[in-house]
């Protein structure tokens, strides 16, 4: 059952207090008081660095009239900063055990609403339409669990949502991939996917010590500014993304091998499509530009009929 939980609904029941969520001892005390234990399966690493959250909030809410959709508020450190800068903040949290924690830590934030649901299953068009009707623009700000980084970002980008930009904390390695140049040495399928919908840039690195518990890797904050239109216009988006996925599936081999294995077509058919697209039959996927991948997908589409 979906539970929409507004922080301000029952805030009068709590004694107003200032909670220093950047103090690890206070954080541990709050969590212990509510009997909360971190879940490895949910990838819970809560951001508590007082120097990071204001910078993320500044990037996401550049105007007081903005609405911000937050994914995974944790204990509310970033949420609190967003509430100071935005017209309204709606935070989607999967773990219902965090609701009473957030009720306490965000009791002074009258423009924050917590939605207890799975971001990957939500109808985001409906949510944005209902929750941000009075906001001039809508942005996304999130400290994403590493294991759902790509699915969440691609959902936000591909569903044609009325978003201005996405500011998100991800694993450093993933940040490098998202922000890589298509056709460069770090280019991958997710690089192409992101660049299809947005301009990506790395904002700043975040050390692992900024979280509780500390993960084993460092993170980085990236900004994805959505394009007004598409960067390329393949004949079929479905074929385009299937082509990209297949082409990058065997990074140490030529695109022919990836296309053949990933799309279940013969190497001869894959080679013919590559040559019709004006490309070398020995080309590797990571060397291809967006325009070349678009041309290739159009030719692959002919082989799939």
Predicted regions, residues:
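Catalytic cores of RNA-modifying enzymes
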Residues: 1-242, 275, 286, 295, ...
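An accessory alpha-helical subdomain
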Residues: 220, 224-226, 232-269, 277-280, ...
